[in-house]
Every structure is written in C-alpha cells, then in structure tokens.
Amino acid sequence: MDFKTFGNIGSPTLLLIPGLGVSYEIFMPLIGLLEERFHVIAVQVDGFTLGQNTEFTSVDDQAQQVCKYIKEDLGGHLDIAYGLSLGGKILSQILERNEVAIEHA
C-alpha cells in the first residue's frame, strides 16, 4: 500500500480510497480542484499499485494498513474520508474498527 499526498499540510485532511482495479489516479481531477484547500491523501490499494508488485489480500488487511497510516502519520484523526466502490468497503471496515477518528465519511 502506498499513500500519495497533495495540498497543504495543516489544512483539513481528506482521504480518498479508490475502487477495485483502479489506481489513485482516478481521483486526480478531484485532487486538482481540492488541493489548495485540503491536505489530500490518496490511497494506492495493494494489488493495484502502479509500478509495484503488490498483492491484494483482504479488505480487512487494507483497512488495517490505512488505520496504521492515520495513527502514525496523522495523529489518529481525519477530517473527511471517501471510498469509491471497493474503497467504500475498506472505509466501512476502518469505521467498524473504531481505531481512528474520522469527522465525516
């Protein structure tokens, strides 16, 4: 799993999780619109990471990796999280785990 960051650190934090078979690049038009007002983090889900040989194992594993990133790199807090398709399932698992604070999902 990889995390691509854009925008202004210190601004409200927005996490984007793409769906099955697509990379974070699906969000690039949106990121272009939001990066001036937000600290945007786009997740690169295992198995769909461009230029890397990774393997998708499970939704739970992906959720665990995102939670670890939020705790270690963002102090355990996000302002906004959005998951597209499979990304929504991963986000649901993150919320169910109740390990990090997400204001809006």
What is each model feature region?
Residues 1-12, 72-75, 96:
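Short, Lys/Arg-enriched, disordered terminal segments
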Residues 31-34, 57-59, 98-100:
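Glycine-rich, phosphate-binding/catalytic loops in enzymes
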Residues 4-52:
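Conserved HGGG/HGGXW glycine-rich cap/lid loop of the alpha/beta-hydrolase fold
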